[in-house]
Amino acid sequence: MANVLIRTTEGDITVRLYDETPKHRDNFLKLAEEAYYDGTLFHRVIKDFMIQGGDPDSIGAPAGKSLGVGGPDYTIEAEILPSLYHKRGALCAARQGDEVNPEKRSSGSQFYIVWGKKYSAGELRQMEKQMQMQQEQTVFNGLASKRRDMIMKLRRERDMAGLSALQDELLAETHAICASMPKPQFSAEQKEAYANVGGTPFLDGQYTVFGEVESGIDIVGKIQETPTGRGDRPTSDIKVVSMEVMR
């Protein structure tokens, strides 16, 4: 287990990297030791959500420049674990969306630190329902894609009865598959954290969480309050001055 001191123009943040996510841990340590992050900006900041950095293109970037696509020429295999979640202070890997990145591979350098908000028990229950509906939709879409040729044939023939029967068949298959899968839901620990500490539970299962803030959460809170402009970029630059690995 290793800690990294992130010195910023707003103050110091110390993060602890998880051994459960070794690919992300080792990559972050390597880049920190190479001074890769020195001079980069927190280029995307959203109040009550998160602060994002790690884009090398942000070094010396003029005001108004669009940022967020820079990084090394590799991505990192997802290490998404149910036990590591998006509580306030979680250190997570940014990534491209599912439409171009269905394997949820992480950016080689960009990261974000969660701020989020507190959620009531009712809000978390509603979120669980949405997660379960999303699981069913994902399974249904996967089954439908395998029957694409049949669906197109029935549509060409305008066979509404055939389409309806096929839909019923796919729905029955979907329900059977989902019944055999773990139901998406928050653990008691997650519920307590999201109710009492805060975070972004809707990101769980979608992004790799590979560390957490050990000290300096007040600095994260200060940064997420900063005024922003186009592209959620702070109107005044907030820089990573340097990083120091503390093993």
Where are the predicted features?
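Cyclophilin-like peptidyl-prolyl cis-trans isomerases
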Residues: 1-247
